[in-house]
């Protein structure tokens, strides 16, 4: 890869290299960010990627979505056109684009003791509602949260189905005591999914940033919400699905595992989820069909939400970190069954 050729897309002089961030995820997902400084345009983030979801079409879509977010008052570093007037270029087989250098720090880099734990949270969730209430034109790709569709065409299933399948298979192959229960829950999940699909397809959609985490949330020096960065997982998404997936509280570590069957603890976590959905509801009014569909949707998605799924499998598989993790195998399945049968879920929506 010729870095000089890449750098000269944005200025006639070789820039000063400040730092390089490697965010690659395996040999099929190459992602590098070079923070450089040009004499003419100052600091710039040059991004180099080679994977199945970073394409010229998507980069153009990200640029338009970033402009839309900015027009709503949500700060996002813009994608810069190169010397040829294009948003991206292919150099030696790698896709290259550049963004303005970010004006704010990320939430992962702030002192939460000084600014207040997640002080930015309310405005962050309000921004989701603002985007939902003022939707950008749809794009022909999805976020990673998509249900019934695939984020990446190379994938076999959507994320939620993949999580449900992984849970079933692990129990069947490694914890035979609970294999029948796991298979029964998976079969019920599949039955409900199939029945719900036609209704789900009718729910309203919008285009979202698609990857809210502390490294992508921008905050002021006081810890207040400022905006977002990193739109490479953005896409068209069902509003109810996106709102819920970003709001559903997960477990942080094994010290919280006992709350899975603690009714009062679950109520507190539900209250946090409801509060986040309420903040989204400041700008976005959930429609009647969304409210009528929510209980059925929740019974399908919540039991196998990725945040819980990844923690559960780590608890069961990582014997070094969790030497007694498998003693929770039955509790995990009981929690999944509880989430699949809840009947008062619609009260979480504003």
Can you describe what each PLM-predicted range is?
Residues 282, 302-350:
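ATP/Mg2+ or Mg2+-diphosphate-binding catalytic cores
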Residues 96-114, 169, 303-319:
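A glycine-centered beta->alpha junction motif in the catalytic cores
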Residues 21-27:
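Protein kinase glycine-rich loop
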Residues 144-197:
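Active-site catalytic-loop/activation-segment of kinase and kinase-like phosphoryl-transfer enzymes
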Residues 29-40, 45, 191-241:
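Active-site acidic catalytic loop and adjacent metal/ATP-binding pocket
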């Amino acid at each position: 890869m010729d870095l000089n050729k890449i750098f000269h897309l944005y200025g006639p002089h070789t820039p000063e290299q400040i730092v390089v961030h490697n965010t690659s995820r395996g040999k099929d997902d190459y992602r590098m960010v070079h923070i450089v400084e040009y004499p003419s345009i100052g600091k710039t983030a040059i991004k180099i990627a080679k994977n199945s979801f970073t394409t010229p079409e998507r980069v153009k879509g990200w640029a338009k979505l970033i402009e839309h977010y900015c027009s709503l008052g949500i700060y996002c570093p813009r994608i810069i056109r190169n010397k040829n007037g294009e948003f991206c270029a292919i150099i030696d087989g790698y896709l290259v684009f550049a963004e303005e250098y970010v004006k704010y720090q990320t939430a992962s880099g702030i002192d939460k003791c000084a600014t207040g734990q997640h002080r930015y949270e309310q405005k962050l969730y309000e921004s989701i509602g603002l985007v939902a209430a003022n939707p950008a034109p749809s794009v022909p790709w999805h976020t990673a949260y998509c249900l019934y569709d695939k984020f990446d065409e190379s994938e076999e299933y959507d994320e939620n189905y993949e999580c449900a399948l992984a849970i079933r298979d692990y129990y069947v192959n490694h914890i035979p005591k609970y294999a029948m229960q796991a298979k029964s829950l998976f079969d019920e999940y599949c039955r409900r999914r199939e029945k719900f699909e036609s209704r789900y397809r009718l729910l309203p959609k919008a285009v979202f940033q698609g990857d809210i985490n502390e490294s992508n949330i921008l905050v002021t020096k006081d810890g207040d919400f400022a905006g977002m960065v990193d739109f490479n997982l953005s896409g068209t998404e069902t509003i109810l699905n996106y709102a819920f997936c970003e709001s559903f509280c997960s477990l942080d570590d094994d010290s919280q595992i006992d709350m899975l069957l603690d009714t009062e603890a679950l109520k507190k976590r539900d209250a946090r989820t409801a509060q986040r959905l309420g903040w989204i509801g400041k700008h976005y009014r959930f429609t009647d069909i969304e409210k009528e569909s929510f209980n059925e949707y929740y019974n399908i998605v919540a039991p196998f939400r990725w945040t819980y799924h990844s923690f559960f499998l780590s608890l069961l598989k990582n014997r070094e970190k969790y030497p007694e993790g498998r003693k929770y195998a039955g509790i995990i399945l009981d929690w999944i069954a509880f989430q699949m049968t809840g009947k008062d879920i619609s009260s979480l929506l504003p």
